[in-house]
Design a protein with these regions (language model features):
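A conserved beta-strand element that flanks and buttresses the S-adenosyl-L-methionine
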Residues: 116
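Hydrophobic adenine-recognition pocket in adenosine-nucleotide-binding enzymes
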Residues: 120
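Class I (Rossmann-like) S-adenosyl-L-methionine-dependent methyltransferase catalytic domain
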Residues: 1-57, 61-110, 124-141, 145-201
Length: 201
């Protein structure tokens, strides 16, 4: 029986590595109609036809990465699982750099004009999620955007999709982004647009 007083902790890299070693596509990113529709809604929800540099947090095996790569000069796609990153890199996308990184501590260097956080925030505990939000703010160009997308059903993760989305939105609210809800049904998809010149984290 779980002790209700036990602190919530972010899921470790080993959780995901075990998943991908057992099944290279454990969440059916390649075949699920849900994933296909969500990817389309995500790319349709981008406000610009093209971006300079995109960061995708939690890229998994790179299915969404391939779509995002068509909309930018450079994509940095990160995940905590070495097995998932190796599978993603097999696509040999010329403008994509796939990196093994466990966030928030191993945050990529450089700045981005779009940061995509899709089906990833509920794996973090509240403290790590807020630290991730701060790092995203620091790395985002003035006039940049963030896309958040999360399933709203029951989870056995540290947070629900709604909790994770709202906690992250609260953490970035000090920069006063324009918040646009693009979809809410079984998943929530939102875009946050920041003012040009407002690049102080």
């Amino acid at each position: 029986m779980t002790d209700a007083r036990s602190p919530i902790r972010s899921l470790p890299p080993s959780y995901f590595e075990t998943k991908y070693r057992a099944d290279i596509d454990p969440w059916r990113f390649r075949t699920s109609p849900y994933e296909r529709e969500k990817y389309k809604a995500t790319t349709d929800g981008l406000s610009r036809p093209r971006y300079r540099r995109i960061l995708e947090v939690g890229c998994a095996i790179g299915v969404l990465s391939a779509l995002l790569s068509q909309r930018c000069d450079e994509l940095v796609a990160v995940d905590g699982s070495e097995t998932a990153i190796a599978e993603a890199a097999r696509q040999e996308l010329p403008n994509v750099r796939f990196e093994v990184a466990y966030l928030p501590d191993q945050f990529p260097v450089g700045s981005f004009d779009l940061i995509v956080l899709s089906e990833v925030l509920y794996y973090f505990d509240p403290a790590d999620l807020r630290r991730l939000a701060e790092k995203c703010l620091s790395a985002l160009d003035g006039g940049g955007e963030m896309i958040l997308c999360h399933w709203l059903g029951e989870t056995d993760y540290p947070l629900t999709g709604r909790q994770a989305n709202d906690m992250f939105a609260e953490a970035i609210a000090k920069r006063r982004p324009t918040r646009v809800e693009l979809h809410e049904d079984i998943y929530l998809l939102e875009r946050f647009c920041f003012e040009i010149g407002d690049d102080e984290g």
